[in-house]
Amino acid sequence: MSTYYKNPLIILTVCGLLLLPLTELTGLTTTTASEILIYAIAALGFNILLGYTGLVSFGHGIFFGVAAYAASIIQVKLMPGFIITPMILSVLFTTILGLGIGFLSLRLSGVYFSLLTLSFAAMTFYVIYRWTHFTGGEDGYGGMERPTLFGIDLNNQTAFFYMVMLIFIAVVFLINRLVNSPFGSVLTAIRENSQRASFIGYDVKKYRLISFTLSAFFVGIAGSIFPFLKYYIGAELVHVAHSGEILALSILGGSRHFMGPALGALFFILFRELLSEYTSSW
């Protein structure tokens, strides 16, 4: 029976189900509960790279923000009335982008890798901020809508929360299977001693690239949901500071523990929202 209590999938699922009454108990909104789950997905995805592969990226806000913009633009301009298809297409685009950025960034290692990802984040922010007629620039991008899905009106905040909850559970399941697979064991070996892993016969660069791409994929899932949370997005989603926030979530909860990043998202957003009730400038 004790194995059930130690299973991170079960624990995080239960925590997710308790999240809605917890936020209501603290006087916060259902929107906040949904935001916590979205950032928990992003942090868990980022932690594939940080906690399991041992690489520090300062550019993962790129994948969150680009997925958000892609989902928004696809829905508003190409697929009004749809939500799942724009999300899927945006995640696919973000994954390909992650593969490209990972291929270029992983030519370097250590602090140079981190600085290169930071440079990509700064460049992406500049492009989105300046590409006014396509992204809205400093005014941001709006016009997104939540349609009815399988007869359920997603404009209802509780219904939208449970949609995000289902995605969260699926992501937790997939990442849990991933990190506990032989592939996950190789990533851990690379994190502990990449030279030794190379001597054993593992292609370290290939595994790091796969890890980077998978991390971008899961962060992209979080980003694809975000524009439908508040019906608006801004260029700050791809800013270096936002990448730093995603990094902070993993570190705050504990990057060496599977559940740590999700708990980091919970503590960070709850603290931010509760603090805003007592200060006027948060």
Predicted regions and their residues:
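Helix-loop-helix "hairpin" substructures at the membrane interface of multi-pass membrane proteins
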Residues: 155-234
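N-terminal membrane topogenic signal
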Residues: 1-12
